[in-house]
Design a protein with these regions (language model features):
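Short acidic-hydrophobic surface loop/beta-edge motif
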Residues: 200-206, 244-249, 343-347, 418, ...
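Catalytic cores of large soluble enzymes that bind and process phosphate-bearing ligands
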Residues: 6, 10, 14, 53-57, ...
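Active-site-adjacent bridging/hinge elements
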Residues: 34-42, 64, 100-103, 128-135, ...
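N-terminal, positively charged nucleic-acid-binding surface of large information/translation enzymes
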Residues: 2-234, 258, 275-288, 292-306, ...
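Secondary-structure transition/capping motifs at alpha-helix termini
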Residues: 67-75, 96-109, 129, 133-138, ...
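Short Cys/His-rich metal-coordination motifs, predominantly Zn2+-binding knuckles/fingers
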Residues: 181, 251, 348, 420-423, ...
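Feature 926 captures the class I aminoacyl-tRNA synthetase adenylation module centered on the KMSKS loop
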Residues: 201, 395-450, 454, 498-541, ...
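Structured ligand/cofactor/substrate-binding pocket environments in proteins
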Residues: 54-66, 73, 82-83, 151-154, ...
Length: 872
């Protein structure tokens, strides 16, 4: 046996140093060729900082699946790794340089990359420590990084192959442009915020007839790049001016007036200016009508030489100056305040500019079509859990646009394309040009999602034909949030299909976002973020893990709730105390279960244990972790602790040594299986308890999943135990209601619905007597009877001389008076607008909860009073 368990559960003591031992023992290293492989690749966290609560949730789900599969006999590879996170990391390193009073341009590209690698090593170490604190069963011998040599080779090969097949090209498109970072952004790097702006209505004079058109815009600074004015062809107000020209008040140029059914006749004045280089919709119109696409803004967000006297101004400074000049010139018709969604750079915080730029693109339609075709083939499709997210996935692929993959950064995979300095020829290849002095490599790097899109196979050694790639690809399960289905899951799907002609994973388990207790997304701006390491310090990793995975179903958001984490901690404490009790009974010797000497209570708890095994296994295989957790909570708290342990306190004092031995064996067997069931959820405390009990293996990490226990039991035996337990609850409730001392003997009679007496077995009668001092009798000699419907029977109690009904009436009337006053007080507060509108929402809800509780108690007390008064 291990050491004597501590009197109190201490999560800090239990979790200290345990993880390092597991890693040193190699419990999580994959490679047992005798077993069926199961592979999960971790969604690589960015090396930009510490893990947040969403990471803790995502990785805990994966860890539970991997630990479960190991116990089921699989060779599990859970592959860890991290993402270089292009713009995010570069922004962090830039900020650190700024603190030193320098910029990346001062030190140059090579030195900057050295600093970025230093950053990566610093934060990779932090992330590994956090993984350890969470207890994640990762195979660190296979850890990867999106910029390591192997992955860089994979990235280069996919780029070259796509290019050679005509699926990568250079072209001009409207992209998200960050004027501060001076780079293109992916959609996920743009946060849309509702801000108060203005809608400006300006007058444009028609050249041919002098009529004035009023046109609205939110971005006057882009007017210098206007190329046309559009109206709807069916709009009678403007049919006669199509083909004419109107003067652009910003620069005096005559703009052609054109017609297109894209224009919404019900919006504003139904006249739209077209600025092709600064708006994606205008860009599409310009392509359709072959309009020029001049750019009026520099990459840093200042106005260029097109803008005359406004050249050199910041874009927003230009806006203000231009509007002021328009007002002086009488060009402004009117200005309205306008709430609208505006994209901001996630990294620098500046407003993103839709911007025409020459970039590298992936031609998406052929790649998407191949994925969509394979989604119709059962053994090739990606299965989504929940299924509804497959529609989200396929709809996006069906409407996909070409993907801008170039970024104007230094940190990342540099694009393997060179331009010949003399001829302008483009070379793209796996090897650098043999005469590098004659070639200029593209300065840009690839979008971070390009490399992370290869994660499912590049991490296993591709493009080399490695043993791991052969054994573990395609991977089995990806766990990720619904917010990156487009950005990551879809990209993994089409890049893997292109490179490997296969799916990246068989299943995708989708979870939601972690929100605060008010349902708000956690963010720095709201200051409502929670550091999982703080929670672990205060409550332990096991409590956090159990909370995260048992309070949300697949695809749903999770609300962070400290009271539920407390509940998880209390549950673990309950297990700890139960284990201490079992340890004290069992001692050093591992008891052997003899299924031929089982009591009624033994058979009942083992039957429940078998039911739980079946349900838990089924739901684990379905990814229904919350259902598993809730079932285990109920089984441990209610069945094992509240019932079987209490029942055992009677049988352990039996004079029959076989009964005592059987009770000890069942206590031990069920507890060990509880530890196995819960070990994927709470690995630290289950390991601690396991090692403190007599045990078969050196660690719970190498234990096997419980199996069905065969023993002889009839349905009648199970129903008798259920009936007796229900009878005990009913007798206790009656004694409590009528203030009868718990130790007072009471005569009861158990009968069927047809009023036939139900005789109990000796086991069952002994339990009834021990647990509630009740004796089951065929005849009750009493004129004061009280009945309750219980499970499988009707229970009748002989109440003679046990209750002073007059005294009970007085007590109940007093309680009813108290409850009425509380209800009146709470109702008054909730009818007070000053309280409801000004008090914190949590306080108002507490008062509502109190009112509901008082009303429920009042109804119950009034029913008790009615019962008592019938006896008077």
């Amino acid at each position: 046996m291990g050491k004597q368990m501590a009197a109190k559960y201490d999560h800090l003591a239990v979790e200290k140093d345990r993880y390092q031992t597991w890693i040193e023992k190699g419990y999580f290293t994959a490679g047992d060729m005798s077993k069926t492989p199961y592979c999960v690749v971790i969604p690589p966290p960015n090396v930009t900082g510490k893990l947040h609560l969403g990471h803790a949730w995502d990785t805990t789900i994966q860890d539970i699946l991997c630990r479960y599969k190991r116990m089921r006999g699989y060779d599990v590879l859970w592959l860890p790794g991290m993402d270089h996170a292009g713009i995010a990391t570069q922004a962090k390193v830039d900020a650190r340089l700024k603190e030193e009073g320098i910029s990346r341009y001062d030190i140059g590209r090579e030195k900057f990359l050295e600093r970025a690698w230093d950053w990566k090593e610093e934060y990779a170490s932090t992330i590994r420590q956090q993984w350890g604190k969470l207890g994640l069963s990762l195979d660190y011998t296979r850890e990867r990084f999106t910029l390591d040599d192997g992955l860089s080779k994979a990235v280069r090969k996919v780029f070259v192959d796509l290019y050679n097949k005509g699926l990568i090209y250079q072209g001009e498109r409207i992209i998200n442009w960050d004027p501060e970072a001076k780079t293109a952004l992916s959609n996920i790097e743009v946060e849309h915020k509702e801000i108060k702006g203005h809608m400006f209505y300006f007058k444009y004079k028609i050249v041919e007839n002098g009529r004035e058109l009023v046109i609205a815009t939110t971005r006057p600074e882009t007017m210098f790049a206007d190329q046309a004015i559009f109206v709807h062809p069916d709009d009678d107000r403007y049919k006669d001016i199509v083909g004419m020209h109107a003067i652009n008040p910003a620069n005096g140029e005559a703009l052609p007036i054109m017609a297109d059914d894209y224009i919404d006749m019900s919006f504003g004045t139904a006249v739209m200016k077209c600025t092709p280089a600064h708006d994606p919709n205008d860009f599409a119109l310009a392509q359709k009508y072959h309009l020029d696409m001049p750019i009026c803004m520099n990459p840093d967000g200042t106005m260029n030489e097109m803008c005359g006297k406004y050249a050199g101004m910041d874009r927003f400074e230009c806006r203000d100056a231009l509007v002021k000049d328009f007002e002086a010139a009488g060009v402004v018709d009117h200005i309205e305040e306008h709430m609208h969604q505006v994209g901001h750079s996630q990294r620098t915080g500046v407003i993103v500019e839709p911007y025409l730029s020459k970039q590298w693109f992936v031609k998406m339609k052929p790649l998407a079509e191949e994925v969509l075709a394979n989604q119709k083939i059962e053994d090739q499709k990606i299965h989504f859990v929940p299924e509804r997210f497959e529609k989200t996935f396929t709809q996006w692929l069906e409407n996909i646009e070409d993907w801008c993959i170039s970024r104007q950064l230094w940190w990342g995979h540099r694009i393997p394309a060179w331009t010949n300095k003399e001829t302008g020829e483009i070379y793209v290849g796996m090897e650098d040009p043999k005469d590098p002095e004659n070639w200029q490599q593209d300065e840009d790097v690839l979008d971070t999602w390009f490399s992370s899109g290869l994660w499912a196979f590049s991490t296993l050694g591709w493009p080399e034909k490695t043993a791991d790639l052969e054994r573990y690809f395609p991977t089995d399960t990806l766990v990720t949030g619904y917010d990156i289905i487009f950005f990551w899951v879809a990209r993994m799907a089409f890049q893997t299909r292109f490179a490997m002609h296969d799916r990246p994973f068989k299943d995708v388990l989708i979870h939601g976002l972690v929100r605060d207790n008010q349902g708000r997304k956690m963010s720095k701006s709201l200051g409502n973020g929670i550091d999982p390491m703080d929670v672990i310090q205060e409550k332990g990793a096991d409590a956090l893990r159990f909370f995260l995975t048992t309070n949300s179903t697949p695809g749903q958001d999770l609300r962070y709730d400290e009271t539920k984490i407390d509940s998880s901690w209390n549950f673990i404490n309950k297990i700890w105390n139960a284990a201490r009790y079992v340890q004290m009974q069992v001692g050093d010797e591992r008891p052997t279960l003899d299924t031929k000497t089982l009591s009624s209570a033994d058979k009942w708890i083992l039957s429940r244990r078998n039911e739980v095994l079946e349900n838990v296994t089924k739901n684990m295989d379905r990814y229904e972790l919350a259902m598993v957790g809730n079932e285990l909570y109920s089984f441990v708290w209610d069945d094992f602790c509240s019932w079987y342990i209490e029942l055992s306190k009677a049988t352990l004092f039996s004079e029959d040594p076989k009964v005592v031995a059987s009770t000890k064996a069942v206590l031990y067997t069920v507890l060990i299986d509880i530890l196995k069931f819960l070990s994927p959820f709470m690995p630290f405390v289950t390991e601690e308890i396991y090692l403190d009990l007599p045990h078969d293996k050196e660690s719970l990490n190498v234990e096997t999943w419980p199996e069905h226990i065969d023993f002889e039991v009839t349905q009648d035996e199970i129903e008798e135990m259920q009936m007796v337990m229900s009878a005990i609850e009913a007798v206790r409730e009656i004694k409590s209601t009528y203030n009868i001392k718990p130790g007072k003997d009471i005569a009861v009679s158990l009968r069927t619905d047809q009023n036939d007496f139900i005789a109990l077995s000796d086991d069952a009668q002994a339990i009834l007597t021990k647990m509630c001092h009740a004796q089951n009798e065929a005849e009750l000699h009493s004129d004061d009877l009280l009945s309750r419907n219980i499970e499988h029977a009707v229970l009748t109690c002989a109440m003679n001389d046990l209750v002073d009904y007059k005294e009970e009436q007085t007590k109940l009337l007093k309680e009813i008076d108290r409850l009425n006053k509380e209800i009146q007080r709470a109702s008054g507060m909730l009818k007070n607008p000053g309280f409801v509108n000004k008090a914190p929402a949590q306080k108002v809800q507490q008062e509502k909860d109190k009112l509901a509780k008082y009303q429920e108690q009042l109804a119950l007390t009034q029913k008790q009073l009615s019962d008592v008064e019938q006896k008077l």
